[in-house]
Regions:
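Acidic/His/Gly-enriched intrinsically disordered linker/tail segments
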Residues: 324-414, 441-467, 471
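Secondary-structure boundary elements
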Residues: 342-350, 421-431, 439
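Beta/coil-rich, acidic/histidine-enriched accessory regions frequently appended to metallopeptidases
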Residues: 18-45, 49, 67, 439-574
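Zymogen propeptides/activation segments of proteases
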Residues: 15-199, 203-207, 211, 215-219, ...
Length: 574
C-alpha cells in the first residue's frame, strides 16, 4: 500500500480521520527494559511501556499461516488494518515503503502455482501408482529393458503446453548426454539458428550431472525412480518457450519446470522424473518478444534445474515415500530458492572473493567489481533482488502466502527466512524440512523446536539488526544476525552498481517524518494495513521514561486470533 495512505498525526491536533490510540494502562501493558540491541516480542493488543528513555524500533506483525483468501485469486487475500501509537514526547521515524498495485501474480507465477496444485491433485494417484510398481517383482531382464528404453537415441516425450489448460503435445528428442545421474535430451524441433550446438547442450548435461544434482540429493534427499533407470531426464524444448506466447510480457517467461503428473501414471504422464527447460533461439514471453539469447539460457537453465530438482525431491520425500501431502507452497518455493543459493555457493567457492569487491582477478569473473562470479549470476542475484523488493513494499506481500499465491517477492522473503533459520539451526535442518510428513509452519516448528511466531519475530529483528551500523563485535546476539551473509554490505554494493533496481543501500532504511508530522508531547498515532504474514517498521526516540505504546485493531480491543498479531520491540543505540 502507498505510504501516503498512512495517517500520522499528533492527537493534540487530531481530526476525525486521525486514529486515537489510548496509552496502555499499567495493568495491561508489558514493561520493556532493554539494553542496546535488546529484543522483546509481545502479543498484539497487549500494549507495552518502555521503562527507559531512548531510541526504539517497533515491528508490528501478523505471524499468521492461516488461509485468509475469500476466493481463488491473489486479490482475494485481504489486508487487515491496525493502529499503533502512544503517549510521549517523541521524535519518530517511519520506514519507507513503495506503493505496489495489489501484488497480483504474473502469468509465469500463476503457472508455477498451478504446477504445485497439480502435484497436490495428482498425489493420491501417484501414491497408488507407486504402490503398484512396488508390488511388481522386477527381474534383471525387466530392469535392463527399462534402462535400455530410457536411453534410446531418439524418443518421444509428452510436454504440458498450456499455462492454464490440461493440454499436452508430443515431441521427439535426441539424446545428447548420458551420465551417472542425468539423461539430457534435446527436442529435434529446437532452433539451430541462435541455438546451442549439441556439444553445448551436452555441457549442460555434465554440469547438471556432476555439479548440481549431487548438491540437491546430498542436502534434501533422493529423487524417486519410478522408471527404474537410475537417472533423471532433462528435456530442452521450445514448447516451454511457447507457454507464454499469449501473455505478451517480454522478459516474463517460463524458464523450466517439473511436472508432478509425470509420476502419477495418468494418460499424459511420461512415467519418469523429468525437468523441462526452455531453449535459446525461440521467442518467449509474448508473440512480439525477441528470441531467448544464448547467454540468457546459459544463466537461467542451471539455476532453474537445481530449483525444480528440489520440487522433485520434495514430492518424492513427502508424497511417494511417506504417503503424505505435498509441502505448503510458500515453504516448498523457499526451499527451492535455497537450492539455488547452494548451487551459487559452489561457484563462489571456486572463485572466492574473501571480502566484497574489488575481488581477486580470475577467469571466473568478467570484472573484479562483481560480488558474485560469472557462474553464480543465475543463482544468487535474483534471490537478493526478490527479498529486497519484498521489504521495500512489504505491506502488500506475505511470507507465508495465504492460499499459496506466491509472488516472486514472497519467494524472496521465504528464501531469506530459511537462510536465517539454517544459520541459526544448522545446514542439516534443510534435509529435515524435506524428509518428513509435516508441512508448512508445523514443519518449521518441528524442525526448529520453537513456535513459528517466535521464529518469525526474531527473523524480522535479524533483518533490521544484521551488521547494524556502529555495532561492535558481540554486541548483537547471534540470534539476530545472518551468520552466512552480510546483508547490509551486499545490498550497499548492489545499490552502487545497480541503483535502478536497488535505489537505497538497504530496504529497511528509514527516513525522518516531515516537519509537520513530528510527534508532539501529546501523542502519536499511525493507521495502516497489512497482509497476514507481513509486518511494518517504525522507529522513534523518547526523551522520557515509561513511554506507552499500543498495537491494536481500529475497532474492538483485540485482533483475530488467527492473525497471530504481535509486536517486536528493539532497543537501538542513541
Amino acid at each position: 500500500m502507498a505510504r501516503a495512505a498512512l495517517a500520522v498525526a499528533a492527537l493534540a491536533a487530531c481530526s476525525d480521520k486521525s486514529p486515537t490510540i489510548p496509552n496502555p494502562t499499567p495493568t495491561t501493558a508489558t514493561k520493556v527494559s532493554l539494553s542496546a540491541f535488546g529484543v522483546l516480542t509481545v502479543p498484539g493488543s497487549a500494549g507495552i511501556t518502555m521503562v527507559n528513555a531512548g531510541r526504539y524500533a517497533v515491528l508490528p506483525q501478523f505471524a499468521s499461516t492461516t488461509d485468509f483468501a475469500t476466493g481463488t485469486g491473489r486479490a482475494t487475500v485481504p489486508s487487515y488494518p491496525f493502529l499503533i501509537g502512544g503517549v510521549a514526547p517523541t521524535t519518530a521515524r517511519i520506514a519507507q515503503t513503495a506503493p505496489v498495485p495489489g501484488a497480483q501474480l504474473s502469468a509465469v507465477e500463476s503457472f508455477h502455482m498451478r504446477l504445485r496444485r497439480i502435484e497436490q491433485e495428482e498425489a493420491p494417484r501417484a501414491i497408488t501408482y507407486m504402490r503398484t510398481l512396488q508390488q511388481r517383482a522386477p527381474t534383471n531382464g525387466s530392469v535392463n529393458l527399462s534402462v535400455q528404453a530410457s536411453q534410446l537415441q531418439n524418443r518421444d516425450f509428452k510436454v504440458l503446453s498450456s499455462l492454464t489448460a490440461n493440454t499436452y503435445v508430443t515431441v521427439n528428442a535426441r539424446l545428447v548426454h548420458s551420465g551417472t545421474n542425468i539423461l539430457l535430451y534435446v527436442d529435434n524441433a529446437a532452433p539451430t539458428a541462435g541455438g546451442f550446438t549439441d556439444v553445448e547442450y551436452a555441457s549442460f548435461g555434465r554440469q547438471f550431472d556432476t555439479d548440481l544434482f549431487p548438491i540437491d540429493v546430498a542436502v534434501f534427499g533422493s529423487t524417486s525412480d519410478i522408471d527404474a533407470n537410475g537417472r533423471t531426464f532433462v528435456l530442452f524444448t521450445p514448447v516451454v518457450n511457447r507457454l507464454t506466447l499469449s501473455s505478451g510480457q517480454c522478459g516474463s517467461y517460463v524458464a523450466g519446470f517439473f511436472n508432478g503428473a509425470d509420476l502419477s501414471g495418468n494418460a499424459n504422464a511420461n512415467k519418469g522424473e523429468i525437468f523441462y527447460s526452455s531453449v535459446p533461439g525461440e521467442p518467449a514471453g509474448g508473440p512480439t518478444c525477441n528470441p531467448l539469447s544464448l547467454n540468457v539460457v546459459r544463466n537461467a537453465a542451471p539455476a532453474t534445474f537445481i530449483h525444480e530438482l528440489q520440487h522433485m525431491i520434495s514430492y518424492n520425500q513427502h508424497v511417494l515415500t511417506r504417503t503424505a501431502s505435498t509441502e505448503a507452497i510458500w515453504l516448498n518455493e523457499g526451499l527451492s530458492h535455497m537450492a539455488e543459493e547452494l548451487g551459487g555457493k559452489l561457484y563462489e567457492s571456486r572463485y572466492p572473493c574473501p571480502n566484497l569487491p574489488p575481488c581477486p582477478a580470475s577467469a571466473g569473473r568478467a570484472s573484479t567489481a562483481q560480488i558474485f562470479p560469472d557462474s553464480a549470476q543465475g543463482f544468487l542475484p535474483p534471490n537478493f533482488g526478490n527479498a529486497y523488493d519484498f521489504f521495500s513494499s512489504r505491506l502488500d506481500y506475505s511470507l507465508t502466502s495465504p492460499t499459496g499465491f506466491g509472488t516472486i517477492e514472497e519467494r524472496g522473503v521465504a528464501w531469506l527466512f530459511l537462510r536465517w533459520l539454517v544459520d541459526q539451526k544448522g545446514d542439516a535442518r534443510l534435509r529435515d524440512l524435506v524428509q518428513t510428513r509435516n508441512v508448512g509452519a508445523a514443519n518449521v516448528e518441528a524442525v526448529a523446536g520453537e513456535s513459528f511466531t517466535a521464529l518469525y519475530a526474531d527473523f524480522l529483528a535479524a533483518t533490521l539488526l544484521d551488521d547494524y551500523p556502529g555495532a561492535t563485535a558481540g554486541q548483537i546476539a547471534t540470534r539476530y544476525q545472518f551468520t552466512s551473509r552480510n546483508l547490509r554490505a551486499i545490498y550497499k554494493r548492489l545499490n552502487l552498481v545497480a541503483t535502478a533496481s536497488y535505489p537505497t543501500p538497504y530496504p529497511l532504511d528509514v527516513a525522518d517524518l516531515a516537519a509537520s508530522g513530528v510527534l508532539t508531547q501529546a501523542s502519536m498515532g499511525v493507521s495502516a494495513q497489512m497482509k497476514p504474514g507481513s509486518f511494518d517498521l517504525f522507529q522513534f526516540t523518547s526523551t522520557v521514561a515509561n513511554v506507552g505504546l499500543s498495537f491494536k485493531p481500529p475497532t474492538g480491543t483485540t485482533f483475530l486470533n488467527t492473525l497471530n498479531a504481535q509486536l517486536t520491540v528493539v532497543r537501538l543505540p542513541n
